[in-house]
Design a protein with these regions (language model features):
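Conserved alpha-helix/loop element of class I SAM-dependent methyltransferases that forms part
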Residues: 201-225, 256
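Class I SAM-dependent methyltransferase core
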Residues: 228-230
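Bacterial N-terminal signal peptides
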Residues: 2-11
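Extended charged low-complexity segments that act as oligomerization/scaffolding linkers
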Residues: 16-17
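Class I S-adenosyl-L-methionine-dependent methyltransferase module
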Residues: 20-182, 222-225, 234-300
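Class I SAM-dependent transferase core
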Residues: 183-198
Length: 300
């Protein structure tokens, strides 16, 4: 895996350097008019806007909403770290999200002591990278040192209540006689949830299987893949399923897809380039640092 990882990082580097030379700005209506006109009458948000001023207001509002969901996703990951993390405390992990709240609806004692443990870890001069990530995030949000523990506890309560709400909706949908209603519920359940940076390994296997089938059918010729775009590579902080945090912060998907392409003979190491696109600036910063380290001869 290391060989392919180094190759991947080297391939990322040119794309990162190009991005650093561009100017980030909002698109004007004139620049997107031809595209959104294709969706007139479709109900797609923003597709009915024809005025430059209205478009500018709408796209800025969308940007604020997305950034708010990114922050909420980080807050969700922090709650998972509190529930299951072992890198900052020796306290036993909680069995599940439900154990975070007592019957009264307040944060349970077992959860409170873990909240306190993380708050204490935040004061350490040289904490682990996840704790440092949390501290920097709270600082950016303007959370004062003396208010950290209260914020973490309130956020954990909010997170747990949301998880219970999702489960309740799924259970109610499961009782419906219409299978389409169940699918609709599952498909829209997380439409407003925070955008977490954590990923799953499973899509990587599915992608490799798909590439293998396409190659077998002749849809992709050997050695023809030269550029790969990974939308939402993510950053494994503490996963939603088990909350493991014993490994360094890492992004796997860019390396997994490139390794699959090389292993299947669909691309050549010397001619493969990968570009990553993510809404979360922390993910983009991580990938940029990976590329910088690679140029300095450091493996990932």
């Amino acid at each position: 895996m290391l060989f392919f990882a180094v190759l991947s990082v080297l391939a990322v580097a040119p794309a990162i350097s190009l991005l650093s030379e561009t100017q980030v700005r909002y698109l004007g209506h004139a620049e997107v008019a031809d595209t959104i006109r294709l969706f007139t009458g479709s109900g797609l948000p923003g597709s009915e806007i024809t005025d430059e001023s209205a478009w500018d207001a709408w796209i800025r509002d969308q940007d604020q909403q997305v950034r708010a969901r990114i922050d909420r996703g980080v807050e969700d990951s922090i709650s998972n770290l509190i529930l299951y993390g072992t890198s900052y405390t020796k306290l036993p992990r909680l069995e599940s999200t439900d154990k975070a709240l007592a019957a009264t609806g307040e944060v349970s004692r077992a959860a409170r002591v873990r909240v306190h443990a993380l708050a204490v870890a935040l004061d350490i001069a040289s904490p682990g990278e996840r704790v440092r990530f949390v501290r920097e995030f709270l600082t950016l949000k303007g959370i004062a040192k003396q208010g950290r523990e209260q914020f973490l506890a309130a956020n954990l309560r909010r997170f747990t209540e949301e998880q219970r709400g999702y489960q309740q909706k799924l259970e109610e949908a499961g009782k419906a006689p219409d299978a389409a209603e169940v699918l609709l519920t599952r498909g829209t359940l997380y439409q407003t949830r925070g955008l977490s940076v954590d990923t799953s390994l499973l899509p990587n296997y599915a992608l490799e299987d798909t590439l293998r089938v396409m190659a077998a059918k002749g849809a992709i010729a050997a050695g023809k893949i030269k550029r790969i775009a990974v939308i939402g590579p993510g950053l494994d902080f503490t996963d939603k399923r088990d909350g493991y945090d014993f490994y360094p912060l890492q992004t796997i998907q860019p390396f997994a897809v490139m390794e699959a392409v090389l292993r299947l003979g669909l691309g050549k190491p010397e001619g493969l380039e990968i570009v990553t696109l993510d809404l979360n600036p922390a993910v983009n910063a991580h990938v940029a640092q990976v590329a910088k380290n690679a140029r300095a001869g450091m493996a990932y």
